[in-house]
Curated annotation (Swiss-Prot):
<dbReference type="GO" id="GO:0006412">
    <property type="term" value="P:translation"/>
</dbReference>
<dbReference type="InterPro" id="IPR035956">
    <property type="entry name" value="RimP_N_sf"/>
</dbReference>
<protein>
    <recommendedName>
        <fullName>Ribosome maturation factor RimP</fullName>
    </recommendedName>
</protein>
<keyword id="KW-0963">Cytoplasm</keyword>
<dbReference type="Pfam" id="PF17384">
    <property type="entry name" value="DUF150_C"/>
</dbReference>
<keyword id="KW-0690">Ribosome biogenesis</keyword>
<dbReference type="Pfam" id="PF02576">
    <property type="entry name" value="RimP_N"/>
</dbReference>
<dbReference type="GO" id="GO:0005829">
    <property type="term" value="C:cytosol"/>
</dbReference>
<dbReference type="InterPro" id="IPR028998">
    <property type="entry name" value="RimP_C"/>
</dbReference>
<dbReference type="InterPro" id="IPR036847">
    <property type="entry name" value="RimP_C_sf"/>
</dbReference>
<dbReference type="InterPro" id="IPR003728">
    <property type="entry name" value="Ribosome_maturation_RimP"/>
</dbReference>
<dbReference type="InterPro" id="IPR028989">
    <property type="entry name" value="RimP_N"/>
</dbReference>
<comment type="function">
    <text>Required for maturation of 30S ribosomal subunits.</text>
</comment>
<dbReference type="GO" id="GO:0000028">
    <property type="term" value="P:ribosomal small subunit assembly"/>
</dbReference>
<comment type="similarity">
    <text>Belongs to the RimP family.</text>
</comment>
Length: 146
């Protein structure tokens, strides 16, 4: 079983959402970002400890070698990767970087309008744009401090 499948199965099985995974260049440090959409208060230390303990056991059983495992909440500027996330966070401010420039630009920031027919809608200061979902390299929410 590959690492992403192993992580997804374990994290979802514990009742959390797997947001993102980062690995150090040599694969010795694994950073796992989790969320609990049903929980109003977000991820806390107990959630991270629960996932960490379970993943440590799973890695031992699966004979997956690592030096350090870090579990964290996705933070206010969370990564937006999955198609469902582009719907879930509709109406929020987002930064998007595309692989292939569109209209001479690779970086966009505006209000997320959602995902429809494989295109992510974005309201910019002057107009609305549609970006191909498959062309998105990175997307992050922009935190609001009201």
């Amino acid at each position: 079983m590959d690492l992403n499948t192993l992580l997804e199965t374990t994290v979802v099985g514990l009742g959390y959402e797997l947001v993102d995974v980062e690995m150090s260049p040599r694969g010795r440090t694994i950073r796992v970002f989790i969320d609990a959409p049903a929980k109003e208060t977000g991820i806390d230390v107990e959630d991270c400890a629960k996932v960490s303990n379970q993943l440590t056991r799973v890695f031992e059983v699966e004979n997956f070698d690592f030096d350090r495992l870090e579990i964290s909440s996705p933070g206010l500027d969370r990564v937006v990767k999955k198609a469902a996330d582009f719907e879930r966070f509709s109406g929020q401010e987002i930064q998007i970087k595309v692989r292939i420039p569109q209209g001479g630009r690779r970086n966009f920031q505006g209000e997320l309008l959602g995902l429809k027919d494989g295109k992510v809608g974005l309201r910019l200061a002057k107009d609305d744009v549609e970006l191909e979902f498959t062309n998105i390299e990175k997307a992050r929410l922009v935190p609001r401090f009201d």
